[in-house]
């Protein structure tokens, strides 16, 4: 079994758990603060267990929930966010997914991000960025959407620097609440913007998927856009200050 095949099977099992069996009481239960700094819920830990089962043969797993699951011999690191946007999931808001980054010598060479709400799955490796659905694994190349009307501004509700200035540009945006998943859609939307503390669980896979786009990643600001004009307009809001 290849790494991609294992990752797909893990996502399919998790999707089956969510959409067929459904959430139960313990899935909503909060547990301890996870390795990523957020409180893990029961469904976070269930999802992690599924990914560890499928991916542990390939290398050491670094999970946002429980931290490190060591591999005895492999130098490969696999960075996972078992549920990206778990607050959305627990609030029954259909925008949540999973993120997997396969790291060789500190560099991401293979990434899988899945939207568990609608089944979209994005995979990037040496063959480029491709997209399919979990139910129909017919992968097609991802190209830039030239008709996008909105961008994504994750965590806009707690923006300290950009939000007041962004309104002056007249750009439409949404703040759906799953950063890694939003990065997977960066070729579709006008831009993806984030202000705040960034963790490797959030950006490792998405940054690799966006490396062909215009990108700014420094301190607490992350901006990516397929449109150079929009990228320049937004980046000047914080580069010049």
Which residues are covered by each model-predicted region?
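Short secondary-structure junctions
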Residues: 23-31, 58-61, 130-132, 169-176, ...
